[in-house]
Swiss-Prot record:
Entries under SUPFAM superfamilies matching the protein: Phosphoenolpyruvate/pyruvate domain
Segment forming the signal sequence: none
Annotated organism of origin: Salmonella gallinarum (strain 287/91 / NCTC 13346)
GO biological process, any: carbon fixation
Catalytic activity: oxaloacetate + phosphate = phosphoenolpyruvate + hydrogencarbonate
Gene3D superfamilies membership: Phosphoenolpyruvate/pyruvate domain (1.20.1440.90)
Record protein name field: Phosphoenolpyruvate carboxylase
Similarity comment: family membership: Belongs to the PEPCase type 1 family.
Domain of life: Bacteria
Cofactors named for this entry: Mg(2+)
Keyword Secreted tagged: no
This enzyme's EC code(s): 4.1.1.31
């Protein structure tokens, strides 16, 4: 196995060496020696040397306050470099995943070999491909944008060094550049000083588009086209772009008072400005390239006499002028100036598409297909993927905010209190108002600030250019009136089109009721008329797992999707399921291919819409080549799920899942909700309280400032347990339930489920991944250093439970060790542990010092606080996900 990763290991070792030289230059030999000693002790401790483990603990406990930060930074930066090397390895010619685009070819060959599938059926499935990736600014992207950029540059250096033909002097130049970049990273503060604003988050999203997706999407389509031509003799049409990007940055106001209507308006303008900026660069290249004279009569008629000598350039220059005028107008609007709209303002994709496509058709007709299919084709595909808005945005708001707004309106009008009405009365009122021609909102009424904000947001949606807002997502949706209420508020704002409104079902009860809610809605004639045969429903993964534990949540998600698919099919409605997955297992994260194939049959017929969160955006779309790889994996998984759907689970399997769900939920809630020691234990054994100090996302960590675990957002909840390596939310309850079913004599049935049902095997695979990252001795060390002795028995009980869970999962999967079928991931975790362990031990020490200072009423030591933040960021890098 090691041979396969020798290229990765040698890159990691080389980057570590350069980092060591940088530390020596910056801080002297003694600090480097200290870091090296700790690294060697950690390696030996991992290999099972108990004496060296004790020495590691003592060494880190005895660091002076001046040594804390350099040591923490050394290991944290090393993990960032290891992640960079690993990301490069995934796309390098020597890496195992080098040709993920090849995954499409493999899938096409597999499909062609199916006796009941012909080329026409496969072609039809390709043509109906739809993939919408929704970028969210969860506070999980811990790494600063400036460092992400440097990591990208380091990646380029690794690529150049991989070239066997590189001359010695070039190799020296690349190595010098690598040293500069690592030195720049070392001398850059890795922790942000302020929380990012929602606008900063949106700019981070635009940077991903510019640095990676802009090139990655056309490259992916070329790759897809090549594989289709080779395997099916079929070419993609110019306008076929199955990928769209949407963003929650600047649109997601659920529990985030910092996202206001004004912010959303600003982000929409900023997004359009960025689109003009990127398209101007494209057009600049096309003006230079399209110097041809031959053109069709249609194109010559379009350019007239004035443009006859260089018709293509003439059209491109005209388009450039329109883009520049649009950009100037948007710039003025962003500065708050109210300017009249210029003639030819670009607001719709067709305005960009038409002149470009006219050039394309003419070049093809005049025998210049080779030119048409170059830079011009890439730009046309960008128009289809990104277009005038660049990325569309979703608006997300919590259901109670709409209920409160309507309550305020009905009370003012003297017709009662909407908030206290029954569901039937609410629906009757809403349908009556939706059918009414008169406005509901009184003219001179002064609403409260909260209600004004809800109404202003609806006004922003109504005024935005059509197509720039993708959907309105209602979090914590529970009833049909939650959906109708939003439609009424949008109608009152003067919206002139049917905006997709997606209820988000996210607690266990809401998932179980999702089908009833949608059935009631689809039985309302007005509603059926409005949606025109299309419905989007969002399935929440994070909050359901936090509410009931992963096993119960994942089964509720499966059943809700299954029921919704069948209901919509019966009603002739095209359903798009929108998956709100996180990067970590406790928030529904799983490798894309496995996750999609484990969903109910038919769940991808309406395409895939899924959130891509925080740090996962960088891992999956941080480089153009990685983007090609990720999009190819999604494409092959969607094709496979639609053409070779997983089997319907047997009734006996469903009964077992019902049983597992009940037992695991009872176990999970028994600890999290009912054990009086649990919350004090959680608060002391993890850095939960300290996490609030990290300037991560623009969203507060809690939905409400007071309250226990239930008010904590899913992300800090997971993040805290990831830091102390117990990883509790991602497994608690699951193993206990499996053990009980095994004791009931159903092990062989569980083994069959693991073998023949992708849903179940993916669940077990995700548990194995979590178990591989969890660490009993580190979790125990946090307890000893930070937790009151009276709470130690609870910590021991949880660790014993984890050990039992690992045994039962291995027995069902028939494996002797974790991750046996994914050695690449096991290797990656082992590689990191040597550097993550010292950060964990150091973090426990820093938490101890920080809390002691607070207890003594002294002011915090900035060296301790800063080092603590660095360890939190470093462990997140080591675990490859935060929350």
């Amino acid at each position: 196995m090691n041979e396969q990763y020798s290229a990765l290991r040698s890159n990691v070792s080389m980057l570590g060496k350069v980092l060591g030289e940088t530390i020596k230059d910056a801080l002297g030999e003694h600090i480097l020696d200290r870091v090296e000693t700790i690294r060697k002790l950690s390696k030996s401790s991992r290999a099972g040397n108990e004496a060296n483990r004790q020495e590691l603990l003592t060494t880190l406990q005895n660091l002076s306050n001046d040594e804390l930060l350099p040591v923490a930074r050394a290991f944290s930066q090393f993990l960032n470099l290891a992640n960079t090397a690993e990301q490069y390895h995934s796309i390098s010619p020597k890496g195992e995943a080098a040709s993920n685009p090849e995954v499409i070819a493999r899938t096409l060959r597999k499909l062609k070999n199916q006796p009941d599938l012909n080329d026409a059926t496969i072609k039809k499935a390709v043509e109906s491909l739809s993939l919408e990736l929704v970028l969210t600014a969860h506070p999980t992207e811990i790494t600063r944008r400036t460092l992400i950029h440097k990591m990208g540059e380091i990646n380029n250096c690794l690529k150049q060094l991989d070239n066997t033909d590189i001359a010695d002097y070039e190799r020296h130049q690349v190595m010098r550049r690598l040293r500069q970049l690592i030195a720049q990273s070392w001398h850059t503060d890795e922790i942000r000083k302020q929380r990012p604003s929602p606008v900063d988050e949106a700019k981070w999203g635009f940077a991903v588009v510019e640095n990676s997706l802009w090139q990655g999407v056309p490259n992916y389509l070329r790759e897809l086209n090549e594989q289709l031509e080779e395997n099916l003799g079929y070419k993609l049409t110019v306008d076929f772009v199955p990928v769209r990007f949407t963003s929650w940055m600047g649109g997601d106001r659920d529990g985030n008072p910092n996202v206001t209507a004004d912010i959303t308006r600003h982000v929409l303008l900023l997004s359009r400005w960025k689109a003009t900026d990127l398209f101007l660069k494209d057009i600049h290249i096309l003006v230079s390239e399209l110097s041809m004279v031959d053109a069709t009569p249609e194109l010559l008629a379009l350019v007239g006499e004035e443009g006859a000598s260089e018709p293509y350039r003439y059209l491109m220059k005209k388009l450039r002028a329109r883009l520049m005028a649009t950009q100037s107008w948007l710039e003025a609007r962003l500065k708050g100036e109210k300017l009249p709209k210029p003639a030819g303002l670009l607001t719709q994709n067709e305005q960009l598409w038409e002149p470009l496509y006219a050039c394309y058709q003419s070049l093809q007709a005049c025998g210049m297909g080779i030119i048409a299919n170059g830079e011009l084709l890439d730009t046309l595909r960008r128009v289809k993927c990104f277009g005038v808005p660049l990325v569309r945005i979703d608006i997300r708001q919590e259901s109670t905010r709409h209920t409160e707004a309507l309550g305020e309106i009905t009370r003012y009008l003297g017709i009662g209190d909407y908030e206290s009405w029954s569901e039937a009365d609410k629906q009757a009122f809403l349908i009556r108002e939706l059918n009414s021609k008169r406005p509901l909102l009184p003219r001179n009424w002064e609403p409260s600030n909260d209600t004004r904000e809800v109404l202003e947001t609806c006004k922003v949606i109504a005024e935005a250019p059509k197509g720039s807002i993708a959907a309105y997502v209602i979090s914590m949706a529970k009833t049909p009136s939650d959906v109708l209420a939003v439609h009424l508020l949008l109608k009152e704002a003067g919206i002139g089109f049917a905006m997709p409104v997606a209820p988000l079902f996210e607690t266990l009860d809401d998932l179980n009721n999702a089908d009833d809610v949608m059935t009631q809605l689809l039985n309302i004639d007005w509603y059926r008329g409005l949606i025109q045969g299309k419905q989007m429903v969002m399935i929440g993964y994070s909050d359901s797992a936090k509410d009931a534990g992963v096993m119960a949540a994942s089964w509720a998600q499966y059943q809700a999707q299954d029921a919704l698919i069948k209901t919509c099919e019966k009603a002739g409605i095209e359903l798009t399921l929108f998956h709100g997955r996180g990067g970590s297992i406790g928030r529904g994260g799983a490798p894309a291919h496995a996750a999609l194939l484990s969903q109910p049959p038919g769940s991808l017929k309406g395409g895939l819409r899924v959130t891509e969160q925080g740090e996962m955006i960088r891992f999956k779309y941080g480089l153009p080549e990685v983007t090609v790889s990720s999009l190819s994996l999604y494409t092959s998984a969607i094709l496979e799920a639609n053409l070779l759907p997983p089997p319907e689970p047997k009734d006996s399997w469903r009964h077992i899942m019902d049983e597992l769900s009940v037992i695991s939920c009872e176990t999970y809630r028994g600890y999290v909700r009912e054990n009086k020691d649990f919350v004090p234990y959680f608060r002391s054994a993890t850095p939960e309280q300290e996490l609030g100090k990290l300037p991560l996302g623009s969203r507060p960590a809690k939905r409400r400032p007071t309250g226990g675990v239930e008010s904590l957002r899913a992300i800090p909840w997971i993040f805290a347990w990831t830091q102390n390596r117990l990883m509790l939310p991602a497994w608690l309850g699951a193993g206990t339930a499996l053990q009980k079913v095994v004791e009931d004599g159903k092990q062989s049935e569980l083994e069959a489920m693991c073998r023949d049902w992708p849903f179940f095997s993916t669940r077990l695979g995700m548990l194995e991944m979590v178990f591989s990252k969890a660490d009993l001795w580190l979790a125990d060390y946090y307890d000893q250093r930070l937790v009151a002795k009276t709470l130690w028995p609870l910590g021991k009980e949880l660790r014993d439970l984890l050990e039992e869970d690992i045994k039962v999962v291995l027995a069902i999967a028939n494996d002797s060790h974790l991750m046996a079928d994914l050695p690449w991931i096991a290797e990656s975790i082992q590689l990191r542990n040597v550097y993550t362990d010292p950060l964990n031990v150091l973090q426990a020490e820093l938490l101890y010092r920080s809390r002691l200072t607070e207890e003594q009423g002294k002011s915090p030591d900035p060296r301790v606080e800063q080092a603590l933040m660095v360890t939190i960021a470093g462990v997140a890098a080591g675990m490859r996900n935060t929350g």
